[in-house]
C-alpha cells in the first residue's frame, strides 16, 4: 500500500499589502489580531507568540526557505498555495507565489488551490457594533473568456518542475466546487486547454468538501477526480458510526429515564 502524500495548505497572507491597508489600516496583517489576543480565563495562554520564525513576513525569501526546510523535516511533501482569482483578472496576494515561481526558490514541491469565495468585512470585524456585513471583494464567474484567462494565468505554474502531480496530471484544488456555475464545463475547458499546451493527461481536479458523504458523491459526479475533506472528524464519526449510534442510544435512554 502506498503512503498518503502529505501536502500543507499555505496561506500567503502574512505580510502587508495595499488592499488590507485600505480595509483595516496601514500595516495590518493576520499577526495584528494574533498579537492582540487576551487571556479569557486562568491559565489561558494568550497571546500565543509564534515559535521558530516569530511574527514572520512572507515578503522575505529567507522566511519562505526556512518554512520549506521545516516542512521537509516534518515529512511534508509540498505546499498547496491558496490562489485568489475573483474574475475579470482580479487577484489578491499573488506576489508571494509569483516570486516563488519566478525565482525557483524555495526548491520545494507545490500546487495551487483556488479560494473561490468572496471577502467581506466580517472576516476581521464581527463585533456587535457592526452587524451589517460589507463585501470587500466579490467572487465572480464572468464566463468562458474568464475561464480561459484564469487558465493562462496558472499555466506557468503547471509547467514548473516543482509542481505536484498525480498520474502525471498537475493537481488543482477548488475551495467551493459547487459554487462554480457549471463545474463540468469549467473542468472540460481547462482539460482541453491543458492538452493544447502540452499537459497531455489534463488536470487532476480536487474538490474541497465537508465530511458528508452525499456531498462527496455530488462532487465526483460533476467531474472532479478527488475530494479533500475539510472536516475529518465527520469522516471519523462515520467510521466509528456503530459506536456513536450505541452512545446515542444510551444517552436517549438516560434522558427518558430522567424525565419520569
Predicted regions and their residues:
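Glycan-processing catalytic domains of CAZymes
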Residues: 1-260
Amino acid at each position: 500500500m502506498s503512503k498518503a502524500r502529505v501536502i500543507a495548505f499555505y496561506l500567503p497572507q502574512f505580510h502587508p499589502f495595499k488592499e488590507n491597508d485600505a480595509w483595516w489600516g496601514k500595516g495590518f496583517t493576520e499577526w495584528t489580531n494574533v498579537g492582540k489576543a487576551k487571556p479569557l480565563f486562568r491559565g489561558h495562554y494568550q497571546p500565543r507568540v509564534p515559535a521558530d520564525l516569530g511574527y514572520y513576513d512572507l515578503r522575505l525569501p529567507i522566511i519562505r526557505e526556512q518554512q520549506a526546510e521545516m516542512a521537509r523535516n516534518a515529512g511534508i511533501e509540498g505546499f498547496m498555495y491558496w490562489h485568489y482569482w475573483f474574475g475579470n483578472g482580479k487577484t489578491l496576494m499573488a506576489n508571494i507565489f509569483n516570486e516563488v515561481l519566478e525565482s525557483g526558490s524555495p526548491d520545494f514541491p507545490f500546487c495551487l488551490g483556488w479560494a473561490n469565495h468572496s471577502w467581506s468585512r466580517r472576516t476581521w470585524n464581527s463585533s456587535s457594533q457592526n452587524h451589517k456585513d460589507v463585501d470587500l471583494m466579490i467572487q465572480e464567474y464572468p464566463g468562458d473568456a474568464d475561464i480561459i484567462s484564469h487558465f493562462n494565468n496558472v499555466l506557468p505554474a503547471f509547467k514548473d518542475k516543482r509542481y505536484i502531480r498525480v498520474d502525471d496530471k498537475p493537481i488543482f484544488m477548488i475551495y467551493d466546487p459547487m459554487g462554480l456555475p457549471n463545474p463540468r464545463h469549467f473542468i472540460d475547458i481547462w482539460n482541453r486547454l491543458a492538452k493544447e499546451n502540452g499537459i497531455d493527461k489534463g488536470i487532476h481536479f480536487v474538490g474541497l468538501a465537508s465530511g458528508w458523504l452525499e456531498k462527496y458523491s455530488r462532487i465526483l459526479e460533476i467531474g472532479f477526480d478527488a475530494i479533500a475533506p475539510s472536516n475529518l472528524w465527520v469522516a471519523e464519526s462515520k467510521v466509528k458510526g456503530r459506536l456513536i449510534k450505541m452512545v446515542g442510544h444510551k444517552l436517549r435512554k438516560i434522558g427518558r429515564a430522567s424525565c419520569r
